[in-house]
Amino acid sequence: MISNQPPHFAIIGAGTAGLATAILLARQNIQVSILEKASELEPVGAGLLLQPSGLAVFEHLGLLDEVLRLGAKVTGLKGQLPSGNLLVNSHYQQAHPDFYGVGIHRATLCHVLENKCREYSELITWQMNTDIQTLEETSDQVRVLGTKDGESFDQAFDAVIIANGARSLLRPKEWVKVDQAYPWGAKWTIVPECLELDTEILHQFHDRSKMMMGILPTGTVPHEPKQRL
């Protein structure tokens, strides 16, 4: 790293991993530039289930209370066959009485993390509409090349963290073990909370091993705090 200067890291991608990492680095008094391809952060994606290990990270970030306020507590998983019999009936308390999960919309999670990042505005800077194509490493820095607002982007950093998703083209090729798409797919939708089912359970309905439907409680989204999903 450059001597007599505070370290300056780049994080490529403003998803949950990138934003959480930015917060942790800023806590260590490290300058962070978030490089995001999108022109602005928008609600995208569907719900996800935070496991106890993930919740421990948000507690460390000081964000657990906000995650619990916006998300939905999930105490277990039930998987039902067409006959009505349960294929899966698993509950967190079977592992530990204090364990649980939290269902939450991906955009809500990013909203919580983004707000926390704004608290470190003297250390975290945002460069939106920035598309990175190439990284060039030297002995003491990483050169980041791409475009920003349609113009050439070229900047050196002490370190670069690649957090732009599972389909990132920036990872070393030797890290990519599988480069073929899955031979199956899924459809997602966001609907109001289903009160006919236990709202603390991740419900799954199985038709053999080829078809499954799931209903995950995900709490609320910031712009509609009274509508649970």
Predicted regions span which residues?
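Glycine-rich FAD pyrophosphate-binding loop
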Residues: 10, 26-46
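Active-site-adjacent segment of FAD-dependent monooxygenases/related oxidoreductases
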Residues: 46, 50-116
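Conserved FAD-binding catalytic core of PHBH/FMO-like flavoproteins
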Residues: 114-115, 119, 125-229
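Conserved Rossmann-like nucleotide-cofactor binding loop
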Residues: 17, 40, 167
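Conserved H-loop
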Residues: 31, 64-65, 123
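Beta1/beta-strand and adjacent pyrophosphate-binding region of the FAD-binding site
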Residues: 2-17
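Short, well-ordered alpha-helix to beta-strand connector turns
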Residues: 29, 74, 157-158
